[in-house]
Amino acid sequence: YVSLSPDSVFNIITDDISHQILSRSNCERSKRPKRVFSIYWNVPTFMCHQYGMNFDEVTDFNIKHNSKDNFRGETISIYYDPGKFPALMPLKNGNYEERNGGVPQRGNITIHLQQFNEDLDKMTPDKNFGGIGVIDFERWKPIFRQNWGNTEIHKKYSIELVRKEHPKWSESMIEAEATKKFEKYARYFMEETLKLAKKTRKRAKWGYYGFPYCYNVTPNNPGPDCDAKATIENDRLSWMYNNQEILFPSVYVRHEQKPEERVYLVQGRIKEAVRISNNLEHSPSVLAYWWYVYQDKMDIYLSETDVEKTFQEIVTNGGDGIIIWGSSSDVNSLSKCKRLREYLLNTLGPFAVNVTETVNGRSSLNF
């Protein structure tokens, strides 16, 4: 491991805070089965092989990873927009193209599931795959109200379909009907996708990336607590969480945020995922998706303080582990590969090994 001197920046956490982490995390996790706190590597560092560089050292820091730096492998695999979920696909001219009906209420489930099965066979041919399976689908949200920004087109399209069918209805009646239809079939597509994944790769542990959503640290909701409506809506998604072995809240932070806002963001999202897990009979694990760069400044790695604080919030609020994610654009040149490897060896790795050993009771925290 990297040698840490007493005056190192990693000593900023005292024994008192170490005790606080252990006592608080035990309290938060007490309602659920005690699990080994694990950190996973979900970065396409196989791309660095072309520069004669590998990342075998992740193992030295108690970080679980796929063999040969594979992005999808025996330990963890993420599937981006798999199958043929109904969606309105943006075109370069600003228009949209319907994929499989455009919105879930017009989609063909058979076409989607056949394609999903083919994608799974292509990307993970091993039927005995026993790792973590992450379905990353972000074209729309299964809660109608939550489709804003890039996904709002699906809400508008759904409303227009009902308006054409019932031109004399009031706007409130139209929106209510659009909501009902959209959410019914959104559930159908997402639920059947999970069921098929679990049926064909029985040994794997499955879940959807990003859920539960929280919508905290926003202009309208600046604090750590999740949006009140979102919390109620998360309870309505029990059909999804009941089919997941793992919850994957996303805790990517931004450079423009104040230091305390980054803490709030992680705190609220982990608490919400743990709350949901506690309310489910099978108590799914909570693994936070964590990115080592700032979401709005992707050329800047998280400071040591931000690594420390975000890891600390994941642990103390009851998370069961961390998935370190990275984009292909993070490792698409020799200089970027060198930078990431140096960051792993000098910053990220030491934090990872100290957190895992502390939470799992093998040492006292020594940042």
Curated annotation (Swiss-Prot):
Record flagged with keyword Glycoprotein: yes
Active-site residues annotated for this sequence: 138
Glycan attachment sites: 108, 354
Keywords: Allergen, Disulfide bond, Glycoprotein, Glycosidase, Hydrolase, Signal, Zymogen
EC number from the UniProt entry: 3.2.1.35
Coiled-coil boundaries: none
Disulphides: 48-337, 214-226
GO molecular function: hyalurononglucosaminidase activity
Pfam families: Glyco_hydro_56
Top-level EC class as recorded in UniProt: hydrolase
Catalytic reaction equation(s): Random hydrolysis of (1->4)-linkages between N-acetyl-beta-D-glucosamine and D-glucuronate residues in hyaluronate
A GO biological-process term: defense response
Function: May play a role in reproduction.
Recorded family membership: Belongs to the glycosyl hydrolase 56 family.
Protein's recorded name: Hyaluronidase
Species in which this protein is naturally found: Polistes annularis (Paper wasp)
Lineage: Eukaryota, Metazoa, Ecdysozoa, Arthropoda, Hexapoda
